[in-house]
Amino acid sequence: YFREKNPDVKIVAVQADPTSRPGGSEDPQTIDGIAPFGDPGFPDAAKAPFIVGFDYDEYIDVKGEDAYALGREIAQTDGVFLGQSAGAALHAATIVAQRPENAGKNIVVILPDTGLRYLSTNLFNEDFEV
């Protein structure tokens, strides 16, 4: 859809880095709901159907600690209640926006979830340090 509207659009996918994937490590800061785009070891059958064959230009690995920290910051400073994957998407968008070749360009990010499902997780646990 996006390329039909603008063939020059760049699409960047976001994935949890290997240490931040559920079941990928003992890290308590996993990012749920983001399938690995660029991991050839992750079978297509385990991915959501829209991901298989998805046309993107690059993918960015995001660490759980970065997604959690930005999710908490945005909740405190802007009152926007983000979930884990939304924090990851926003973190990746800031990486893309900081690239010199993107100066003056519009960066659009889709925030795929809300923080409501994560109230009982480490994302919003005040005693858990990022």
Question: Language-model segments: which ranges?
Answer:
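Surface-exposed amphipathic alpha-helices with a cationic face
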Residues: Y1-N6, A97
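A short, acidic, amphipathic alpha-helical segment used as a generic capping/interface helix at domain edges
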Residues: A67, I74, L90-R99
